[in-house]
Amino acid sequence: MSEQPVLDTLADMTAASVDHNSLSPREYMLARVAALVAVDAPPMSWLANAPAISESGLTAEDIQGILIAVAPVVGGPRVMAAGGHILRALGIAIAVADAEIAEAELAAAEDGQS
């Protein structure tokens, strides 16, 4: 059994929903970000979606546009909360990716010295 069965299950559900829709990956993530804002998703939900958001090619401007578009429907406080969650999640995701790249470069350098 996995050490993180809940996260693994959520990742499987996300992968299945990506595979079974007619949207492009970019359109899919536009809709997903809007939904996360609308349901006032907690930081962990944003963190779980951060890799897919990054991989879809959404820019900071795209996310800003989503926040502006949904603000009249979901309200200012939700948009403000989402902004903070997005910043933390994407910041963490970037830091993790940077650490993984650094580890890979270090491993490659060590292999080259052997």
Task: Give the positions of each predicted feature.
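Acidic, glycine/proline-rich low-complexity segments that act as flexible tails and inter-domain linkers
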Residues: 1-30, 38-55, 79-114
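C-terminal structural segments of small proteins and small subunits
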Residues: 64, 69-88
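Short basic/hydrophobic patches in alpha-helices and adjacent helix-turn junctions
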Residues: 52-56, 69-72
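Winged helix-turn-helix DNA-binding recognition segment
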Residues: 58-63
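An amphipathic alpha-helical micro-motif enriched in hydrophobic residues
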Residues: 29-42, 64-73
